UniProtKB/Swiss-Prot annotation:
GO terms under biological process: Mo-molybdopterin cofactor biosynthetic process
Family: Belongs to the class-V pyridoxal-phosphate-dependent aminotransferase family. MOCOS subfamily.
Required co-factors: pyridoxal 5'-phosphate
Entry function: Sulfurates the molybdenum cofactor. Sulfation of molybdenum is essential for xanthine dehydrogenase (XDH) and aldehyde oxidase (ADO) enzymes in which molybdenum cofactor is liganded by 1 oxygen and 1 sulfur atom in active form.
Sites of N6-(pyridoxal phosphate)lysine modification: 236
Domain MOSC: 663-831
Disordered, as annotated region: 637-680
Protein name per Swiss-Prot or TrEMBL: Molybdenum cofactor sulfurase
Keyword annotations of the record: Molybdenum cofactor biosynthesis, Pyridoxal phosphate, Transferase
Organism the protein comes from: Pyricularia oryzae (strain 70-15 / ATCC MYA-4617 / FGSC 8958) (Rice blast fungus)
Alphabetized GO MF terms: lyase activity; molybdenum cofactor sulfurtransferase activity; molybdenum ion binding; pyridoxal phosphate binding
Active site location: 402
InterPro entries xrefs: Aminotrans_V_dom, MoCF_Sase_C, MoCo_sulfurase, MOCOS_middle, PyrdxlP-dep_Trfase, PyrdxlP-dep_Trfase_major
């Protein structure tokens, strides 16, 4: 019966989803409803009609428009209370920005009481709840057992936060973990109130219902059994508006009496000349706490949101049943995935949803936290998972999910481990998410009212396609450790092409045939010396987020001594045909250094002291071209000093180690964030400019050809050849004699086993394989994004959970054959040229 009802619900959503939620494209999957759910088009249309058809004024005035606003706001306040089963006779609702703002309002009010307050919080609390401990006189994080003891009447935890008697004790907990979806009894507030009714210090309760109410009905009922404070965010239920609520039991109103601050609209009278005196409003609690003008339009939109949501999806209990059914399906399907050797693909941290013992609701919400393992038992990097998910337009959350207790318990992370990881540079959202082979975050799939069985099926199919080893072709390749057969120094390759990318992540400039190009320790001359910085954040822009950057074409004009830049996209009104800047380090074209230091730039996670151009017309050219407010900045050679210095991140990978190299590889001490590194080559770290990882990136045409053959074998006639430009390499090598049988250098991917190269008369050291992301899928001619070649690379070139193609290398004056000539005090660096012969050192 339940399945039939859900089938009806699912069919109804399928019928109207394309019309109501056009932002979910046919190939998209949205699985981040715990972050925010999606807003139906009819809600936006209803809100627009309301705004266009009615005149709403500031509620603090007495005009007709103001009175209309006041009347509507109070009606919607009542609707919101009724939505959560809260009688206006026993509760008041305070509009706030979001759940976090409600939590902060409570904590600041309790802090102002004589003696402050003690704080007890459950281990599954969101970071916004944990942060309250900084406002408290003392605080304790409660485990499951300690919480049960407190509810049973134990004063052990209570005594620890009341040694210096506080004005109150606050117990905070979540109705549903935003980490793994576990639900906690809504009866805790009543239980703790009854168990400690005779105590000297009153215990008040704060319920974080933000995650819970997104897909489940909340009925606060009688105030004597309800939490003193309940916080939530409406956008998690309706997608729009961006608004939150703090619902307060009237018996707890007195806890706000010590609050100091007052804003406009919350007082009846203020004296500030000769005397300081004010009279707070003494009616409803919300009149004293809603400082300043309310977010009028957000509140008005809430009225439409409640009506539209109920019209589309019915009562919340129906939404809850549907979302729970989908969660059961996803958990079952993920649990049943196995590699060909029998090992499980997924490690799940969320339990299978079951009805509560009392028959009221479920013990688990529609949130599934998990990680993925390879067939050999190693963890799949969250960064690699996100790259593939982004490629398939799967919108999902990864990381520690703003839940420190949940992540620590699920991954068995001790405090010392988390501190060590932080010291090693690991951050939530950073690309490096493994510490000594152990994950530091999880994947979270969360479902909502407009999710369907198709979303679940297609997501599971995605996991199978990219992460399930069926035995036919291993998803995580283990390259044999073999000794290359050809002797070192045999010539068979030459330089096919040379390309530099003067502006990071923009189009490349091909070095003409016959042109000798200078090579420096930081890389090829003029390569990635400039970048575009976001005006607001100072973050360097990249094609990964802004693919139109591929259409910005720089040209190095050595005769005029300038870098000329044009735009190859569709014509943009009033956009100059081209702009240019001097190649010389002319200080007059940059903003003063004091201006730069106030807003440091960030490139690939590094803080960099770039020099920003002050020409407004120049910066406007780039802003218009890619549609993002940005400025042009430069990080020329010689800028690397102190904290601004950038070093190569490239290193030898496990799959590159041949038999005779094993003794050259050593383990790195714990805390470094890596597991192995190379010790051969230059013993000094290589300085780099604005490249991601190394001074020079090299690819082999034999490898590009092999990859294209693989794509063709998988996609047949629909396959489109991937050009070398997709990989944005500086140096492309090719065979000099195509008629010869394949030798070691002619084999695809043989470059990953080379120790070094001699090009012309200069020696280069190989630093390690190049880790790839979905940016290789951006067409460098059109700026459009596809799914190849990363889709095929992830299935054929994945090692240790990471995808590689091409190799990093560096030239350095430390090699015996590399002579740097000093002439008249200037350094004369060597050159490289298209067509030069290449000797391989294996």
């Amino acid at each position: 019966m339940a399945q039939n009802l859900d089938a009806q619900y699912n069919a109804a959503v399928e019928r109207f989803r394309s019309e109501e939620f056009p932002m979910i494209r046919v190939d998209s999957i949205y699985l981040d409803h715990a972050g925010t759910t999606l807003c139906p088009k009819s809600l936006l249309e209803a809100f627009a009609r309301d705004m266009a058809g009615n005149l709403y004024g500031n509620p603090h005035s007495a005009s007709n428009s103001s009175q209309l606003s006041t009347s509507r706001i109070e009606d919607i306040r009542l609707q919101a209370l009724q939505l959560f089963g809260a009688s206006p006779d026993e509760f008041d609702l305070v509009f706030v920005a979001n759940a976090t703002a409600g939590i902060k309002l409570v904590s600041e009010s309790l802090r102002a009481r004589d003696g402050g307050f003690g704080f007890l919080y459950h281990q599954a609390s969101h970071t916004s709840l944990v942060g309250v401990r900084e406002e408290a006189q003392s605080s304790i994080c409660l485990s499951e057992d300690e919480t049960e003891e407190l509810l049973a009447g134990s004063t052990t935890s209570l005594d620890l936060v009341t040694r210096s008697p506080p004005g109150a004790v606050l117990l905070a907990y979540t109705a549903q973990s935003n980490f793994d979806g576990r639900r906690y009894p809504l009866t805790w507030a009543d239980k703790v109130r009854r168990a400690h009714a005779s105590g000297c210090t009153p215990i008040c309760t704060l319920l974080d219902a933000a995650s819970f109410v997104s897909t489940s009905p909340l009925h606060l009922g009688e105030s004597k059994a309800a939490p003193d404070f309940t916080v939530l965010s409406f956008y998690k239920i309706f997608g729009f508006p961006d608004l939150g609520a703090l619902i307060v039991r009237k018996q707890a109103w007195h806890l706000f009496e010590s609050r100091k601050y007052f804003g406009g609209g919350t007082v009846d009278m203020v004296v500030n000349f000769k005397e300081s005196w004010h009279a707070p409003k003494n009616g409803f609690l919300h009149e004293r706490l809603e400082d300043g003008t309310l977010p009028i339009h957000n509140i008005l939109a809430l009225g439409s949101a409640i009506k539209i949501h109920q019209g589309l999806f019915g009562p919340m209990r129906t939404v809850s049943s549907h979302a729970t059914f989908l969660a059961q399906e996803m958990i079952t399907n993920l649990q049943n995935l196995h590699h060909s050797n029998g090992e499980k693909v997924c490690t799940l941290y969320s339990p299978y949803p079951k009805p509560n013992v009392d028959g009221n609701g479920w013990n688990q919400g529609p949130i599934i936290a998990f990680n993925i393992c390879t067939s050999n038992g190693s963890w799949v990097s969250l960064g690699e998972f996100e790259k593939l998910a982004s490629l398939r337009d799967i919108n999902i959350r990864t990381g520690s999910l703003c839940n420190p207790g949940g992540i620590a318990i699920a991954l068995a992370l001790e405090p010392w481990e988390m501190k060590r990881n932080f010291s090693a540079g690991l951050r939530c959202g950073a690309d490096n998410d493994m510490a000594l082979g152990k994950p530091t975050g999880v994947i979270r799939a969360s479902l909502g009212a407009m999710s369907t069985t198709s979303d679940v099926d297609r997501f599971v199919a995605f996991i199978v396609e990219f992460f399930c080893d069926d035995g036919a072709a291993s998803r995580d390749l283990q390259t044999p450790r073999v000794q290359p057969s050809l002797a070192s120094g045999e010539a068979e390759l030459c330089v096919d092409s040379l390309t530099i990318y003067p502006i990071k992540s923009c189009a490349g400039y091909s070095i003409p045939h016959g042109k000798q190009w200078q090579v420096r320790p930081e890389g090829l001359a003029w390569d990635r010396e400039w970048c575009l910085l976001h005006r607001g954040s100072g973050q360097a822009l990249s094609q990964k987020r802004y693919p139109k950057m591929a259409l910005i074409k720089p040209v190095v004009d050595l005769e005029s001594g300038r870098l000329a830049v044009g735009y190859l996209g569709e014509p943009i009104p009033y956009l100059p045909e081209r702009v240019s800047v001097p190649l010389s380090h002319d200080p007059s074209v940059f903003r003063p250094s004091t201006y730069v230091s106030a807003a440091p730039s960030r490139v690939c996670g590094d803080q960099v002291a770039t020099k920003i151009y002050h020409d407004d017309e120049l910066n406007e050219f780039f802003s218009k071209a890619i549609g993002v407010p940005c400025v042009l900045a430069r990080f020329p050679p010689g800028s690397q000093h102190g904290d601004a210095q950038r070093s190569s991140k490239a290193r030898l990978q496990k799959h590159q180690i041949t038999t005779d190299q094993e003794s050259d590889v050593q383990e790195v001490h714990p805390g470094s964030g890596t597991t192995t590194d190379s010790t051969w080559g230059n013993d000094k770290s290589q300085n780099i400019l604005l490249s991601n990882e190394s001074p020079i990136l090299l690819i082999n045409l034999a490898s590009v050809d092999a990859l294209n053959q693989e794509i063709k074998s998988r996609k047949g006639s629909s396959a489109v050849r991937i050009p070398t430009s997709a990989f944005r390499a500086n140096v492309v090598l090719r065979r000099t004699d195509e008629s010869r049988p394949d030798g070691a250098q002619g084999l695809p991917y043989a470059e990953e086993r080379w120790r070094g190269l001699t090009i012309g008369n200069q020696t280069y050291t190989m630093l390690g394989a190049c880790r790839r992301c979905q940016m290789v899928c951006v067409d460098q001619v059109t700026g459009c994004r596809g799914d190849e070649p990363f889709s095929t690379l992830s299935k054929t070139r994945r090692f240790d959970g990471k995808v590689f193609f091409g190799v990093h290398m560096a030239w350095g004056p430390g090699s015996p054959s590399n002579n740097v000539v000093a002439a008249r005090g200037d350094v004369a660096y060597p050159t490289i040229e298209v067509g030069e012969r290449v000797l391989v050192h294996v």
